[in-house]
Amino acid sequence: MKWTRRDVVLGLPTLMAFNLIGCTAKTNAATNDETATTTETDKKASGATQITAAEILDGYAFTSTAADENAILVNTADEVTISNSTVDKTGDSDGGDDSNFYGKNAAVLVEGGSTTTLTNLTVTSDAKGANGIFSYGGNGGHNGGEGDGTKVIIKDSIITTTGDGSGGTMTTGGGITNASNLTVTTNGQSSAAIRTDRGGGTVYVDGGTYTSNGLGSPAIYSTAEIHVANAALVSNLSEGVCIEGLNSIELTDCDLTANNTKCNGNATFMDTIMIYQSMSGDAASGNSTFAMTGGSLTSKNGHMFHVTNTNADIELNGVKLTNEDTANVLISVCDDGWNGGNNKATFNAKAQDLAGAVLVGNNSTLALNLTEGSTLEGYVDGNIVNAANQTVSTEVGTVTITLDTNSTWTLTADSHVTEFTGTAANVIANGHTLYVNGTALTGTN
């Protein structure tokens, strides 16, 4: 028995009394031509405690010490409620796709179309490939595919993970996660506090603190649609957030702080908001979207925004920006360690103060639009070196700048753009020159 009721004599409750199956793995063998569907995933997953029907459980201690086993596996289309309980997971996974895409070895795995509500849980994972709470929507890892309705609602809970490949909350395969007032801390590599992977899904977060401490472990990693409000997001080694491919992150009244001091994998830049496409198949190609309204964004090291190998839409509205890096780069759009896509970004600033260098590589494109009284204090250039001090570009690419009548740009160095739309008087030269297609703009202040 791998679970106990904490307020009764050990051994009195029985597994079958709660429609639970203890430590029983599925025995059906998958045929060779099966693709990764919910059925196939069921055959891969096993749980120390398996819940296969509607349940309401309160005040239990769930544990798993075995490799490749969930402490709790919910596999039902029914509603399940677990509250005031602890979940402890040890036992390393062999890793790979089963852990990252389908929830093998997670502390809690929910699949099969269930709506599972988790309240006041303490979840501790100390193993490799052991995500904290995993919502798998059953679409077999098909990016853009609909899920089966699996939804995890988790609130007022603590999640701590230690091993590599162990996110706090994990959503894949079209799953849905609704989280509120969580305290999530991850310590391993590739262990985002709010994590998603192949097949995507939808994530809503309201309130709480989400901290990542490992390499390649941003506070949020998006291969999904993610909305976060009223939360504190902290990354102490990696990017603050990463968006891969045709996916999105929306932050509302959040405080995001990142101190990216080490490159991971193919990356050759350090940054706080990284938007890219790896071409690994984990995310469909298309426009990546990052939107932030209110709150604060603090970049302690590297570029504040970095776009590479994808098309990105960035929107800021009334965000307090703090760039503590001495180079003071607001955004770089350029080549990095991936190829096969474009380096192209549209940056919309609304009622927003911006500061820093705008770096656009020779084969890259940026449209920067300032509206509703936004300000930019900075310059545009194409001379770019990466974190290894290697030259990436020596000439500026295609840059268009648009200022509405209430927005201004104060130059901090000579700047070169392809196109300028707005009133020249809204450009404060500050002793410098703005060149538009090689011609100095006249009429600046």
Located regions from the model:
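Surface-exposed loop/turn positions within long extracellular repeat scaffolds
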Residues: E395-I401, L411-T421, Y435-V436, L441
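Post-signal peptide N-terminal segment of mature Sec-exported envelope proteins
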Residues: T31-K43
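Beta-strand-rich domains and repeat architectures in extracellular enzymes and scaffolds
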Residues: S64-A71
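Surface-exposed loop/turn motifs in large extracellular/passenger domains
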Residues: K43-G59, V74-D92, K104-S125, F134-T162, ...
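Feature marking well-ordered beta-strand scaffolds used for ligand recognition
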Residues: G96-S99
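Bacterial lipoprotein signal-peptidase II cleavage site
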Residues: C23-N32
